Amino acid sequence: MSNKPFIYQAPFPMGKDNTEYYLLTSDYVSVADFDGETILKVEPEALTLLAQQAFHDASFMLRPAHQKQVAAILHDPEASENDKYVALQFLRNSEIAAKGVLPTCQDTGTAIIVGKKGQRVWTGGGDEETLSKGVYNTYIEDNLRYSQNAALDMYKEVNTGTNLPAQIDLYAVDGDEYKFLCVAKGGGSANKTYLYQETKALLTPGKLKNFLVEKMRTLGTAACPPYHIAFVIGGTSAETNLKTVKLASAHYYDELPTEGNEHGQAFRDVQLEQELLEEAQKLGLGAQFGGKYFAHDIRVIRLPRHGASCPVGMGVSCSADRNIKAKINREGIWIEKLEHNPGQYIPQELRQAGEGEAVKVDLNRPMKEILAQLSQYPVSTRLSLTGTIIVGRDIAHAKLKELIDAGKELPQYIKDHPIYYAGPAKTPAGYPSGSLGPTTAGRMDSYVDLLQSHGGSMIMLAKGNRSQQVTDACHKHGGFYLGSIGGPAAVLAQQSIKHLECVAYPELGMEAIWKIEVEDFPAFILVDDKGNDFFQQIVNKQCANCTK
């Protein structure tokens, strides 16, 4: 066997970058000559300013292309009424968030930075530190949330109080530019990243497509669809596969070629992307509460692989599609242009439109009366809640379990009021609350039967589908799970939440137990006291309302 000649293949050969940028400043950059080459000198302040501005913009604004996809739902005759309702709420939320006070989502995410530094770019070193300072500045100065926990030992944690550390991955490349992708990645969508170790046997058209559709179905609605879904097939390692998933979901690899070659270049399979998008529309899950728009788009990327391995990765970017490019070149610091005026996509006739029929529910009365009212309505019923709600999420539930385990009574407020799974962002001056949308319900599933057996958590409010144990617990104890739209945290803070106060564990920050007063807070009955589960009915094709 003759040896093949050496040929270097760039693993991700990209086409032209068509991103539209704006010039932040021409300060902090200069050029110099060294060893016959022109060098771009970048001051440390440039990296700090770039990171600070990029994460500020991404926290309050989204890409124009994404907003146009949301707006298109309103004009699609095949979209369900629930699809259109959710899309309208997203646009209203974006219009509020774009003012720069209330962030798009209360989970303002882990700050992730991917940087590609040209060999003729000099910064003097310490890039991770100066970029981290920019992240710090944004999270400290804006009304964002601190979501990062530092481990003091294997089991004890403390909130870092700054949202640091950031995840920063820097690469050396050719050229005289420094290019970045900045991602504010919330926990809900990050948790929908999966790796499947498969074999060559999967690589037939029928098997692969069916496999991907079934995996796509398992995403559920907990990470706030409509999604930007990414599949990656192959990879020289598992970690390469998942890195590619992350970047593909951010549309970073959109300019890849659309066919492979014998040297192993990555490519997009645009035909399979379209086929999978059509399958996603048939799932019935829609934009959270049934319909067509489970996904805005799908990316499928094929990578080379070791003959003994076939990793398959899946991930999403959620409705808070907070991805933004930036770069530094001779002209200065450039930031990707996001949509400053998302309100332009709201049709005038929907400006003052009501929300359609919703059952009014007064929460300021005995729990038995509230439960009796809810019991009159089927799953999928839209509700409008007014009154007192308790707010608590992961650590709060662990604390409540500790009380029961210690033989103590649950606090009366857990018995008297619904509990909303959420953690607020910082409260801006003059506002009753910071952005406060729901977190993923499924993480609290294991607590439901225990709490309800002790008279607490009888009405739960959160986002996404839940496990059978929650349906069983609600059937057994007469409880309900109500769904809140995942994503429009700013509009909830501005329009529905009238008061916020901490009632327990203030040292836990966003994980504390809070009390809110709400007015016309939107929700849907998803699990009732009779053993019905809205999402299971969709799967079983039994929900008559989900595709109207």
From Swiss-Prot:
Cellular-component GO terms for this entry: cytosol
Catalytic activity: (S)-malate = fumarate + H2O; (S,S)-tartrate = oxaloacetate + H2O
Cofactor annotation remark: Binds 1 [4Fe-4S] cluster.
Enzyme type, top EC level: lyase
Binding site for [4Fe-4S] cluster: C105, C224, C318
Enzyme nomenclature, EC number: 4.2.1.2, 4.2.1.81
Outcome of gene disruption: Disruption of this gene seriously impairs growth under anaerobic conditions on D-tartrate when glycerol is supplied as an electron donor (D-tartrate fermentation). Cells lacking this gene also lose most (about 79%) of D-tartrate dehydratase activity.
InterPro entries: Class-I_Fumarase/Tartrate_DH, Fe-S_hydro-lyase_TtdA-typ_cat, Fe-S_hydro-lyase_TtdB-typ_cat, Fe-S_hydroAse_TtdB_cat_sf, Fe_dep_fumarate_hydratase, Fumarate_lyase_CS
Hydrolase listed as a keyword: no
Reported induction: Is mainly expressed during anaerobic growth. Is under the control of the Fnr transcriptional regulator.
Listed SUPFAM superfamilies: FumA C-terminal domain-like
Subunit structure comment from the entry: Homodimer.
Similarity comment: family membership: Belongs to the class-I fumarase family.
Protein name: Fumarate hydratase class I, anaerobic
Source organism phylogeny: Bacteria, Pseudomonadati, Pseudomonadota, Gammaproteobacteria, Enterobacterales
Gene giving rise to this polypeptide: fumB
